[in-house]
């Protein structure tokens, strides 16, 4: 995999990004279409940044939210927020203008940060599924099994593995020496796109489907446990009935998360594998649509995992009412009905 950029090329005023042989053709949109696309992308980035920023703030500020599960949510929110802040602005301009105007250094940096934040988000979704599975299917041992230290290990793995993987395919000599074998297969030069040969294209497959299979299998088990509890709810005490209701809600939330995860990432992952075999035949517009579908998952995460919980609504209300500036607010029990 390699980010390709021709530095020092002059921009062609009509049909090409740069005045060199093999330069990317520039798609010229009308001003109205450009405005619509920019506004849509800006709205998406705003949701991603503000939604995840508030998740990070709420978990950090309110002491009642300092739990292993919420620390995973905090780390997930940071990954998605950084994606919206550092990656998507440049991706928006590249998608609308169909050209890269920011030089070789930013091309490399953007190419590194994009998969880093996306993979980190995917890994955290998988770890949150594991956490919810332990909490629902093994509630008695959960407090001792999933501690803050365990959560921090998951967070370290969730950032460390994607960082190592992304560094491997961008900055190792192995990739550089094999680049000449398939560099000519790239669609054009000067586009700052990730180019995947067959090996890297198919390596992306388990990075998507392994977390997906883990989440699906855990969801099925959680759903079975929650359904069994619902059938026995008439014989349960009030407290246990409340716990069963909470478990069913967790199962529903996880099911929605898995479904949206598949919807957002499946088109891009399949296209990446197929494209590496068929000499990069995917039109740039179609590729942009697929990758923005994947980006959209980062906007859904705070809605799926947090907006449906009462503690988040209470935290949001306290913040908007400016009561958050009171010293006593930090110790408020957000879980109290």
Curated annotation (Swiss-Prot):
Residues 176-189 are annotated as: Extracellular Loop 2 (ECL2). CDD domains: 7tmA_TAAR5. Its main location: membrane. One of its GO terms (biological process) is sensory perception of chemical stimulus. Disulfide bonds join 24-188, 99-192. The chain crosses the membrane at residues 35-55, 71-91, 110-130, 155-175, 205-225, 254-274, 285-307. The keyword Transmembrane helix applies. One of its GO terms (molecular function) is trimethylamine receptor activity. InterPro entries: GPCR_Rhodpsn (IPR000276), GPCR_Rhodpsn_7TM (IPR017452), TAAR (IPR050569), TAAR_fam (IPR009132). Residues 56-70, 131-154, 226-253, 308-337 are cytoplasmic. Keywords: Cell membrane, Disulfide bond, G-protein coupled receptor, Glycoprotein, Membrane, Receptor, Transducer, Transmembrane, Transmembrane helix. It holds the Pfam family 7tm_1. The keyword Endoplasmic reticulum does not apply. Residues 1-34, 92-109, 176-204, 275-284 are extracellular. Glycans are attached at residue 21. SUPFAM superfamilies: Family A G protein-coupled receptor-like. GO terms for cellular component: plasma membrane. It is found in: Cell membrane. It is a multi-pass membrane protein. It comes from the Eukaryota. Belongs to the G-protein coupled receptor 1 family. PANTHER family: HISTAMINE RECEPTOR-RELATED G-PROTEIN COUPLED RECEPTOR, TRACE AMINE-ASSOCIATED RECEPTOR 5. Olfactory receptor specific for trimethylamine, a trace amine. Trimethylamine is a bacterial metabolite found in some animal odors. Trimethylamine-binding causes a conformation change that triggers signaling via G(s)-class of G alpha proteins (GNAL or GNAS). In addition to the well known disulfide bond common to G-protein coupled receptor 1 family, trace amine-associated receptors (TAARs) contain an unique disulfide bond (Cys-24-Cys-188) connecting the N-terminus to the extracellular Loop 2 (ECL2), which is required for agonist-induced receptor activation. This is Trace amine-associated receptor 5. It comes from Pan troglodytes. The gene is TAAR5.
């Amino acid at each position: 995999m390699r980010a390709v950029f021709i530095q020092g090329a002059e921009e062609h005023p009509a049909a090409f990004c740069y005045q060199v042989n093999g330069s990317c053709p520039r798609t010229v949109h009308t001003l109205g279409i450009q405005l619509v696309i920019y506004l849509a992308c800006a709205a998406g980035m705003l949701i991603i940044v503000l939604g995840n920023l508030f998740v990070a703030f709420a978990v950090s500020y309110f002491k009642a939210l300092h739990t292993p599960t919420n620390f995973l949510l905090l780390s997930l929110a940071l990954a998605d927020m950084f994606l919206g802040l550092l990656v998507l602005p440049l991706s928006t301009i590249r998608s609308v203008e169909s050209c890269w105007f920011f030089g070789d250094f930013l091309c490399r940096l953007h190419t590194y940060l994009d998969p880093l934040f996306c993979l980190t988000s995917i890994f955290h979704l998988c770890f949150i599924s594991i956490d919810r599975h332990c909490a629902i299917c093994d509630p008695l041992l959960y407090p001792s099994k999933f501690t803050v230290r365990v959560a921090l290990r998951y967070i370290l793995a969730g950032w460390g593995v994607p960082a190592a993987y992304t560094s491997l395919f961008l900055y190792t000599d192995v990739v550089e020496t094999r680049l000449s074998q398939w560099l000519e297969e790239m669609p054009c030069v000067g586009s700052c796109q990730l180019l995947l040969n067959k090996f890297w294209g198919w390596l992306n497959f388990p990075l998507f489907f392994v977390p997906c299979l883990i989440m699906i299998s855990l969801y099925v088990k959680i759903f079975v446990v929650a359904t069994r509890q619902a059938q026995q709810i008439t014989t349960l005490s009030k407290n246990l009935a409340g716990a069963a209701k909470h478990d069913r809600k967790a199962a529903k939330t996880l099911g929605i998360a898995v479904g949206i995860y598949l919807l957002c990432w499946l088109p891009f992952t399949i296209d990446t594998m197929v494209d590496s075999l068929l000499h990069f035949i995917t039109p740039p517009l179609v590729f942009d649509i697929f990758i923005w579908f994947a980006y959209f998952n980062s906007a859904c995460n705070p809605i799926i995992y947090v907006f449906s919980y009462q503690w988040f609504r209470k935290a949001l209300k306290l913040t908007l009412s400016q009561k958050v500036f009171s010293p006593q607010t930090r110790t408020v029990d957000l879980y109290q009905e």
